[in-house]
Amino acid sequence: DLTNFTSAVIDERAFVKLSGAIDAAKASGDAEIVAGGTYDRSKGWYIRPTLITSTNPGNDIFRTEYFGPILGIFVYDDADFDKVLDLVDTASAYALTGSILATDRAAVELAQQRLRFAAGNFYIN
């Protein structure tokens, strides 16, 4: 059914964790939900795909693996790229996947070198 944007998460425990993260972002002074941010358990454990930005690189949205449709976004100035690589490398003890999206080949090569052990799977585009 192409009218569905997402399916339910796996169980109630996952629903509680994900909806709690959304509620924490809504209550946070340094985070903003820019898309999604809703959930509904009336017919299953549905979490709308959610994008959350934060000005705080220490926000839980960047340190917790949610295994659900939540993506944390940290916007930074290009001049701070080197510092941001350090933040990415130290943000979490765990990282299932990581990715670099850039048009500057030198930035891609630097990030690839600095972050090669930062995640289990690493994508470059």
Question: What does each model-identified segment do?
Answer:
Residues Y39-S42, Y46-N125:
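Conserved C-terminal structural/oligomerization subdomain of aldehyde/semialdehyde dehydrogenase
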Residues D1-G20, T38-Y46, R63-G68:
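Flexible, acidic loop-helix segments that line cofactor/substrate-binding pockets
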Residues A8, K26, P49-T53:
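Hydrophobic transmembrane signal anchors and adjacent membrane-proximal interface regions, especially
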Residues G29-T38:
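Short secondary-structure junctions
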Residues G20-S28:
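Helical element adjacent to the flavin cofactor pocket in flavoenzyme catalytic cores
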